């Protein structure tokens, strides 16, 4: 199958790699021949909910590398990012950005930053949120809070 884009970008914290992250990453590799992955630095995540429970950058990086290896993905580059835009406004050859419904507004910010630098805006490829069994979506925040597992299943509380 021919992939519609030569180079795509996707970004995130990718803490406790869950089904939502995997769907996002799979879509990026499905539509792009080469995937740039922006992985948030430890400094960037300090103000996230349950920040103290977010895995360090190196462990999140290892989880991504393991996921890519298991799935046979070899056409990628992971770059540490310190801002929401990261490097997406500096690589001229990017053609698309892959986001979830929830992060669509971030793609608009990336495109605005690209236009300010005289670069062509990216096509926006959007995936639906992956639902959990207890709420509207699987999220790392719910996992860090101990409410669900990475598959969206509720965790049993000790009585």
From Swiss-Prot:
Catalysed conversion reaction: (R)-4'-phosphopantetheine + ATP + H(+) = 3'-dephospho-CoA + diphosphate
Keywords assigned: ATP-binding, Coenzyme A biosynthesis, Cytoplasm, Nucleotide-binding, Nucleotidyltransferase, Transferase
Compartments in which it is found: Cytoplasm
Pfam families xrefs: CTP_transf_like
Superkingdom of the source species: Archaea
Primary location: cytoplasm
Disulfide bonds: none
Enzyme class: transferase
Recorded GO CC terms: cytoplasm
GO BP annotation list: coenzyme A biosynthetic process
Gene Ontology MF terms in the entry: ATP binding; dephospho-CoA kinase activity; pantetheine-phosphate adenylyltransferase activity
Pathway where it operates: Cofactor biosynthesis; coenzyme A biosynthesis
The EC number(s) this enzyme carries: 2.7.7.3
Family per similarity comment: Belongs to the eukaryotic CoaD family.
Job of this protein: Reversibly transfers an adenylyl group from ATP to 4'-phosphopantetheine, yielding dephospho-CoA (dPCoA) and pyrophosphate.
Matches recorded under HAMAP family: PPAT_arch (MF_00647)
Name of the molecule in the record: Phosphopantetheine adenylyltransferase
Source taxonomy: Archaea, Methanobacteriati, Methanobacteriota, Thermococci, Thermococcales
């Amino acid at each position: 199958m021919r992939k519609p884009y030569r180079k795509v970008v996707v970004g995130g914290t990718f803490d406790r790699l869950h089904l939502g992250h995997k769907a996002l990453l799979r879509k990026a590799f499905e539509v792009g021949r080469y995937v740039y992955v922006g992985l948030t630095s430890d400094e960037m995540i300090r103000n996230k909910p349950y920040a103290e429970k977010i895995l360090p950058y190196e462990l999140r990086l290892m989880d991504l590398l393991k996921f890519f290896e298991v799935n046979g993905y070899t056409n990628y580059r992971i770059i540490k990012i310190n801002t929401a835009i990261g490097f997406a406004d500096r690589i001229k050859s990017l053609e698309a950005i892959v986001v979830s419904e929830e992060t669509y507004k971030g793609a608009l910010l990336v495109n605005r930053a690209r236009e300010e630098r005289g670069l062509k805006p990216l096509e926006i490829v959007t995936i639906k949120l992956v639902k959990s069994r207890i709420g509207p979506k699987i999220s790392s925040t719910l996992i860090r809070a101990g409410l669900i597992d990475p598959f969206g299943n509720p965790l049993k509380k000790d009585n």
